[in-house]
Amino acid sequence: MGQMGTRQSLRNLNNTTPTITNPMEEIISPIPREVLKAELTPDKHLRMTNKSNNEVYVVTWQDSPNVVMEIGRLREIAFRAAGGGTGKSYDLDEYDTCDNPYKQLIVWDPEEEEIVGGYRYILGKDWEIGSDGQPNLATSHMFRFSERFMKDYAPWTVELGRSFVTLEYQSTLRGRKGIFALDNLWDGLGAIVVIEPTVRYLFGK
């Protein structure tokens, strides 16, 4: 009877249809274009891109909160499409919104009035160092930085992360605009190296 009861219980479990829940939150609505344009002021403009006539800006949560929210929305869409994503309604974390936040480098399409893609980054000179001598970075859980690295490399290093290209610019839907999306982002990274004389090294995930 014991074996029969066990077999029957297993049959009941096998015949039970599991309840499937969707852990993904609904992504927030797009930030209105006029709100974004109001925050993309000339003082945040870094350069024009070499191709596609797009614009590169550098913003932070403190000076452009709506632009950063839109970045979080677009990141989540792009990462979900690649099988990832945070599952939250937008992809922002404490490194984006803290008192000493990562800067956000974005490519802006002035014709379509939308963000093409972006990176977030923080200069070595701005790293916050803990009592253990380790920097508080998004990659800190992946590495233990040696004393030599912190002394000889960190001051001249930029940590990069959360790179994305907006979904529509990952295809041919935007023609040449889409083809050169990554080139445009690299234009921005190149400009950072030029305007920041301390930068020699780039790393990230």
Protein language model annotation of sequence segments:
Residues 1-23:
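Non-catalytic C-terminal accessory region of glycerolipid acyltransferases
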Residues 76, 126-205:
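Acyl-donor binding region in acyl/amide transferases
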Residues 96-106, 129:
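A short helix-loop-beta-strand connector motif used in the catalytic cores of GNAT acetyltransferases and
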Residues 99-103, 111, 115-116, 153-155, ...:
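Short, well-ordered loop/turn elements at secondary-structure boundaries
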